[in-house]
UniProtKB/Swiss-Prot annotation:
Protein name (database record): Probable protein phosphatase 2C 2
Catalytic activity, EC: 3.1.3.16
Molecular function terms, GO-annotated: metal ion binding; protein serine/threonine phosphatase activity
Tagged with keyword Isomerase: no
Record-linked Pfam families: PP2C
Cofactor binding mode and count: Binds 2 magnesium or manganese ions per subunit.
Listed cofactors: Mg(2+); Mn(2+)
Function (record text): Enzyme with a broad specificity.
Alphabetical GO biological process terms: signal transduction
Length: 300
């Protein structure tokens, strides 16, 4: 059996909500893939003045993405730096905390409960792209190739950069760790250089967590938000395969129009976007992945 279904699963699971400063719609669709391995989080006003959104694109199984979806916010809220409003450090530490939890006996037991197969060991991992809004400041932490794009002055302001093995800095680390990059893949296998999980790439006891073949340490980008900023678009890589960032934002803006933005209007914008991105068939390979997007409208 190949990676694709004979017909795509077009039904969507969409959640909407709002807080003091944001309205959001999060929508996911399995599409042509045999299984759904995306996960996501959305929590406006998780505490006063803080909202959190994130997408996690699983690979090698769904279990790590589901584990992170369940635990990320709880661990972030427990973090000492988070409580002190040191959000950049808190995000970095929470990414690493996910890996720490995964290797515990309790973590392994939970992974086995999520797994779709009966194999003894999980070789799964996931990307992580998390946006934290504190008052008028946006932080985006990224490990992997999911993305956040800010619609600023009706143009794209990119909040993350993909971590790919061919990137010179990433490739250098991989080679120092004793690995190699072939066809854009770590040791010929994984086409990401940073991810949560993927524990078999992180087992060299002589290396620190930031020196392994694959690392969970995110880049964090910070920007001050203003009246020129309209919404965030978070997505797993399946959302970004067929349209460039500017065209994605145009598609969303065409749905929003000049109307007052509501949860239902954002729901329509998110679901219409996934429908447009879904390929009519699998011959080209693009538009065939699981798709998850979160639209976060910034109230004025």
């Amino acid at each position: 059996m190949g990676p694709y279904l004979s017909q795509p699963k077009k039904d969507k699971t969409t959640t909407t909500g709002q807080g003091k400063s944001v309205i959001f719609a999060a929508s996911e669709m399995q599409g042509w893939r045999n299984t759904m391995e995306d996960a996501h989080i959305h929590k406006p006003d998780v505490i006063q003045d803080v909202s959190i959104f994130g997408v996690f694109d699983g690979h090698g199984g769904r279990e790590v993405a589901q584990f992170v979806e369940k635990h990320f916010i709880d661990e972030l809220l427990k973090n000492k730096n988070f409580k002190e409003q040191k959000f950049e450090e808190a995000l970095k530490e929470t990414f690493l905390k996910m890996d720490e939890l995964l290797v515990t006996p309790e973590g392994q037991k939970e992974l086995n409960q999520y797994k779709a197969t009966d194999t003894d060991e999980s070789y799964a991992g996931c990307t992580a792209n998390v946006a934290l809004i504190y008052k008028n400041t946006l932080y985006v932490a990224n490990a992997g190739d999911s993305r956040t794009v800010l619609c600023r002055n009706n143009a794209n302001y990119d909040m993350s950069v993909d971590h790919k093995p061919d990137n010179p800095e990433e490739k250098s680390r991989i080679e120092r760790a004793g690995g190699f990059v072939s066809d854009g893949r770590v040791n010929g296998n994984l086409n990401l250089s940073r991810a949560l999980g993927d524990l078999e790439y992180k087992r060299d006891s002589k290396l620190r967590v930031n020196e392994q073949l694959i690392i969970a340490i995110p880049d964090v980008k910070k920007v001050e938000l203003g009246p020129q900023d309209k919404f965030l678009l978070l997505g797993c890589d399946g959302v970004f395969e067929t349209l460039n960032h500017m065209d994605l934002l145009k598609q969303v803006n065409s749905t929003l129009g000049q109307a007052q933005v509501t949860e239902e209007l954002l729901r329509k914008a998110a679901e219409d976007l996934l429908d447009q991105l879904l390929a009519p068939d699998t011959s080209q390979g693009t538009g065939c992945d699981n798709m998850t997007t979160i639209l976060v409208y910034l109230k004025k």
